[in-house]
Amino acid sequence: MPDAVVFSPGGYRYIPAVFQYSAGIAAEPGFEIERVRFHRPVPLAEAFVAVESHLRAIGRPTTSFAQCELRSPDPFNDQGFIDFNTEYVKTLERWGIYKDRVNPVARTNVCPMYDKPTTPSMFAFSYTVPTTSAAKRPSFQLAGGGDARGGSAPYKDRIVAFGDTSPEGLREKVVFVIEEMESRLKTLGLGWADAVSTQLYTVQNIGHLVGPELARRGCGAGGLVWNYTRPPVIGLEYEMDVRGAVRETVL
């Protein structure tokens, strides 16, 4: 995994990943991360306007935008995901964040099985704010990570235990993803003790794995939240992210 890179205009560091998102972010000294959740997911174009308005109201630049959580109607095919992401990053480019296919903003994008939005929408977002006192604890947000290895091959060629939702197939997927989360935490100089909450995103029955493969590692100290959703690309079955904001509010 690459080393974290400082995004000075935003007051945070990030783990480089792909053009559509980074693998995670953490506040730099002198800053901390706040998370804002919409009461219900807001269509993406409207949400970006709301984010700009919120940041302006608290005196923060758009470059302080560090992470977001999206909800989409259904999983994309490979090309559909590329097309969506190409459109998504245009706003980040306008905000002075995204440039030359480098994107410091972390992101989770999942698809609810029920109560799904009619269009890709934003559920929550995070940003940095300056602090004048020493941080009581580090603040960070990890991007959603699914059961696919990195690379440029089609997803079906990279998905761990592709098409296998047997108990052992799911175990292989869950272990792969949680080890990825642990690697990201380590890269940011963090551990499970720093997490506020850990989120699971799947419609598969992973109850037999929560104890031995998840809670046993320490990721449940702040609570494990199981979202009955699917990852954003057809064929993926399991995703996780980890939150560590210092404050969370609901608009």
Curated annotation (Swiss-Prot):
Keywords, ordered alphabetically: Aromatic hydrocarbons catabolism, Hydrolase, Plasmid
Induction behaviour: By 4-chloronitrobenzene.
GO BP term (any one): catabolic process
Activity regulation: Cysteine residue modifying agents such as p-chloromercuribenzoate and the SH-binding metals Zn(2+), Ni(2+) and Cu(2+) completely inhibit deaminase activity, whereas Ca(2+), Mg(2+) and the histidine residue-modifying agent diethyl pyrocarbonate inhibit the activity by 23 to 50%.
Name of this chain's protein: 2-amino-5-chloromuconate deaminase
Biological pathway: Xenobiotic degradation; 4-chloronitrobenzene degradation; Xenobiotic degradation; nitrobenzene degradation
UniProt EC number: 3.5.99.11
Transmembrane intervals: none
Catalytic activity: (2Z,4E)-2-aminomuconate + H2O = (2Z,4E)-2-hydroxyhexa-2,4-dienedioate + NH4(+)
Function comment: Involved in the biodegradation of xenobiotic compounds, such as nitrobenzene and 4-chloronitrobenzene (4-CNB). CnbZ preferentially catalyzes the deamination of 2-amino-5-chloromuconate (2A5CM) to yield 2-hydroxy-5-chloromuconate (2H5CM). Also able to catalyze the deamination of 2-aminomuconate to yield 2-hydroxymuconate, which spontaneously converts into its keto form, 2-oxalocrotonate.
Naturally occurring in which organism (per UniProt): Comamonas testosteroni (Pseudomonas testosteroni)
Oligomer status and interactors: Monomer.
An example molecular function term from Gene Ontology annotations: hydrolase activity, acting on carbon-nitrogen (but not peptide) bonds
